[in-house]
């Protein structure tokens, strides 16, 4: 589990503004946060170095780039030895179709959120990759019909 960082009072407005617009200039960010540009720059750097800000990214509409198939895949492992778990995790991390991978409790060991072109591409992902992984015993797929909420911001 990641170590919690104690945020300074000035960090919260910085983080809120950066989550709304990761391309905001340092000058505009400083003005919004009521601090000097140099103090703002130092606080942002400290948040990056402390691992609070992990990266800056653009959010792409997957439908507009041809990735219309969206599913949650529930995976069970038959073997939970460290080697099998590490191999599964390492393998899943290399796959561009896997947007999220969660280790979970309940009836599945892992939940994967998948995006790909279509059902045929998903079938290839299953047959060529997931079913071929040593230790995978069960795979259950739930198709996502509509995404009602997708939020990247977190409350700080």
What are these regions (language model features)?
Residues 1-156:
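A compositional/biophysical signature of low hydrophobicity enriched in polar/charged and small residues
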